[in-house]
């Protein structure tokens, strides 16, 4: 009785939560009765704690409404429901669309003696063992992506299939792909895990066509256990490649074989890609990987310095992190330059030394990101007038973008709160502080605000 009501509860949660929240937190749960207790199994500690903190009241309220005093007790546990041939999982009320081609994944692997043996190279060797979950620096900007990736590594082909990670360059998407691959291979050394850039898929298909080996190409890609494709946006306007990937995608998903894709944009925003593909990209879980916040940037620098055997003073790490905000790759490149200069000159790494070593990079960053530039970018994004940034108007359509611009100015520039207030029509520092706190709160509560803020960060940092 309680387990069947859990399915009804799932329907309630699906109505009340966003698609991403439902896919991320509710879909992976499995339910089983243990006496008078309904046990909800979560795939990992992160999901368990989140559901217990955020959704326990909604779940309890639903069961009380349906069963009154007979409502079961709830208990959370980590793992899979034991002795269950087919776990009761959270499934969407609306069924996934039927595949347009009902193709079973072929069992034969790609013939290395075919006319184009290079295409059948051991792609598993492309999984970089350096990239592990253990050395992925986690912060608010990427914790959902990491949690989803870890779940995929433990349960490939399960709830998050496909997993779609999107965000700007150098934010750690590729690191997570390799970490998942390493996790899958660790649990199953015989797993056929293929990682590649989307352009490699296109090149392989072109070679197969040239060598009359397209059937071998199809068999190879449809027989893998996990397929990870980086920068899927490069499929844009390549119609034949999209057609072939469409059928490969269908075959792999029908066989419960894991697919992970990355892009620099949200699936529906990718130009030049067929709607039927963009629709499929969103069937599983879509997660944004955002630019790292200050604390995460500092942690990345400290981790990188430690790996390089360098003692990086805290104040130096904060100095660099406050000025370079766009992506991890930029941070690591700057630190490598500092380390190289220190090794060459024999000088200690101090703030003054970093100013000198990164003089051109810091000057460029300060030139690119100004309060004026932020105001113009935000005004254009929200389709308001630049003058509204400085006006006293308090309507939400104007006040909210103004608050976003203030928060971005605090995060992306080195100006003080009073200086930011002056730039916004002579407002005082308490107004700026309130705006920063309000936007931080909305980023936690509103998916739209979170997306808008991330989009603006990417635009201003590019």
Curated annotation (Swiss-Prot):
It is found in: Cytoplasm. InterPro entries: AAA+_ATPase, Chromosome_initiator_DnaA, Chromosome_initiator_DnaA-like, Chromosome_initiator_DnaA_CS, DnaA_C, DnaA_dom, DnaA_N_dom, DnaA_N_sf. The keyword Lipid biosynthesis does not apply. One of its GO terms (cellular component) is plasma membrane. Disulfide bonds: none annotated. Residues 1-84 are annotated as: Domain I, interacts with DnaA modulators. GO terms for molecular function: ATP binding; ATP hydrolysis activity; DNA replication origin binding; lipid binding. This is Chromosomal replication initiator protein DnaA. The lineage of its organism: Bacteria, Pseudomonadati, Pseudomonadota, Gammaproteobacteria, Alteromonadales.
């Amino acid at each position: 009785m309680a387990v069947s009501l859990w399915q009804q509860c799932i329907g309630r949660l699906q109505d009340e939560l966003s698609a991403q929240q439902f896919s991320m937190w509710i879909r992976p749960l499995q339910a089983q009765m243990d006496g008078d207790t309904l046990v909800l199994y979560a795939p990992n500690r992160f999901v368990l704690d989140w559901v217990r903190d955020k959704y326990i009241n909604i779940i309890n309220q639903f069961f009380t409404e349906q069963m009154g005093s007979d409502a079961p007790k709830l208990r959370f546990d980590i793992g899979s429901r034991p002795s269950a041939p087919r776990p009761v999982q959270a499934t969407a009320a609306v069924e996934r669309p039927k595949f347009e081609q009902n193709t079973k994944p072929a069992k034969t692997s790609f013939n290395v003696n075919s006319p184009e043996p290079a295409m059948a190279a051991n792609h598993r060797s492309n999984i970089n063992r350096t990239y592990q979950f253990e050395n992925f620096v986690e912060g608010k900007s990427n914790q959902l992506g990491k949690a989803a990736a870890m779940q995929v590594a433990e349960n490939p082909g399960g709830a998050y299939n496909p997993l779609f990670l999107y965000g700007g360059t150098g934010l750690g998407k590729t690191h997570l792909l390799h970490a998942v691959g390493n996790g899958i291979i660790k649990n199953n050394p015989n797993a056929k895990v293929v990682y590649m850039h989307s352009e490699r898929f296109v090149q392989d298909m072109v070679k197969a066509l040239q060598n009359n080996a397209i059937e071998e190409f199809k068999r190879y890609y449809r027989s893998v256990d996990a397929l990870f494709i980086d920068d899927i946006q490069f499929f844009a306007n390549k119609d034949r490649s999209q057609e072939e990937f469409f059928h490969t995608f269908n075959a792999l998903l029908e066989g419960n074989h894991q697919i992970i894709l990355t892009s620099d944009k949200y699936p529906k925003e990718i130009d030049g890609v067929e709607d039927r593909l963009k629709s499929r990209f969103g069937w599983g879980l879509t997660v944004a990987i955002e630019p790292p916040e200050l604390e995460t940037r500092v942690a990345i620098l400290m981790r990188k310095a430690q790996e390089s055997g360098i003692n990086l003073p805290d104040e130096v790490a904060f100095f660099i992190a406050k000025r370079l905000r766009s992506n991890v790759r930029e941070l690591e490149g700057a630190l490598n330059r500092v380390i190289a200069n220190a090794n060459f000159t024999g000088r200690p790494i101090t703030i003054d030394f970093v100013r000198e070593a990164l003089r051109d990079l810091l000057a460029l960053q300060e030139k690119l990101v100004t309060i004026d530039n932020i105001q113009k970018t935000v005004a254009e994004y929200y389709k308001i007038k630049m003058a509204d940034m400085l006006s006293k108007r308090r309507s939400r359509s104007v006040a909210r973008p103004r608050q976003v611009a203030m928060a971005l100015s605090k995060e992306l520039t080195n100006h003080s709160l009073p200086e930011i207030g002056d730039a916004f029509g002579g407002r005082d520092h308490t107004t700026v502080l309130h705006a920063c706190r309000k936007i931080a709160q909305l980023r936690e509560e509103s998916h739209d605000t979170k997306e808008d803020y991330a989009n603006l960060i990417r635009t201003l940092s590019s």
